[in-house]
Swiss-Prot record:
Protein name: Ubiquinone biosynthesis O-methyltransferase
GO biological process: methylation
Involved pathway(s): Cofactor biosynthesis; ubiquinone biosynthesis
Highest taxon in the source lineage: Bacteria
Length: 237
């Protein structure tokens, strides 16, 4: 591979915050708050996670990866930041979660090693942090078994998403550190659907993830104007 599909500035952002990953009152609070929603959504659409081989791409400190392991999945979490991975390993050890492993490896490289090895692949809150999202989608398609499920989440690119995800979340509500997101890396649902089709995946569902700053409640609904999640399957035998 001539060039890694990695933005070193993006990696550095999350490396610097690694020690706070499991602090539910830190900058990662939103990830902890949305995790039950996304975990249940994935679990239901995958027909249950228990007993399945699962890959979490861009796993960070392991909030989603460890929760899927707790549901009975055999989980591999991969990321390009070593500090978050170290935090994930330590937390799993402290919590005695044994059916989880972490590796520092690009997903494209793992796809060359382990094509068609996973029942479920997840890539959540990561696509908007890489230079080439289409390459990530293709690698995920390669890694999942025929009939398996691939899940993505990202942020739409439009004036509303700029207002909510950057101005609102980073500057007004201060839910996230300033500079967490780059508007130009946000991905329209049409662009995501295009990459999914080109990779050979079948789009099953898109749903929006919504937040009320007054009630501090998250919920899922069809509107995908800002944050959204995607369920795809790999057809064929």
């Amino acid at each position: 591979m001539s060039q890694l599909n990695v933005d070193l500035q993006e990696i550095a952002k999350f490396e610097a915050l690694a020690a706070k990953w499991w602090d539910q009152h830190s900058e990662f609070r939103p990830l902890h708050q949305i995790n039950p929603l996304r975990l249940n959504w994935i679990d239901e659409r995958a027909g249950g996670l228990a007993g399945k081989k699962v890959l979490d791409v861009g796993c960070g400190g392991g909030i989603l990866a460890e929760s899927m392991a707790r549901r009975g999945a055999d989980v591999l979490g991969i990321d390009m930041g070593e500090a978050p991975l170290a935090v994930g390993r330590l937390h799993a050890q402290q919590e005695n979660v044994q059916n989880i492993e972490y590796r520092q490896i690009p997903v494209e490289e793992l796809a060359q090693e382990q094509a068609g090895q996973y029942d479920v692949v997840t890539c959540m809150e990561m696509m908007e942090h890489v230079p080439d999202p289409a390459s990530i989608v293709k690698a995920c398609q390669t890694l999942v078994k025929p009939g398996g499920h691939v899940f993505f989440s990202t942020i739409n690119r439009n004036p509303k998403s700029y207002l909510f995800a950057i101005i609102g979340a980073e500057y007004v509500l201060r839910m996230l550190p300033k500079g967490t997101h780059d508007y130009h890396k946000f991905i329209r649902p049409s662009e995501m659907a295009h990459d999914i089709r080109n990779a050979g995946l079948t789009l099953k569902e898109m749903t929006g993830l919504h937040y009320n700053p007054i009630t501090k409640r998250y919920w899922l609904a069809p509107n995908v104007d800002v944050n959204y999640m995607v369920h795809t399957i790999k057809t064929g035998v």
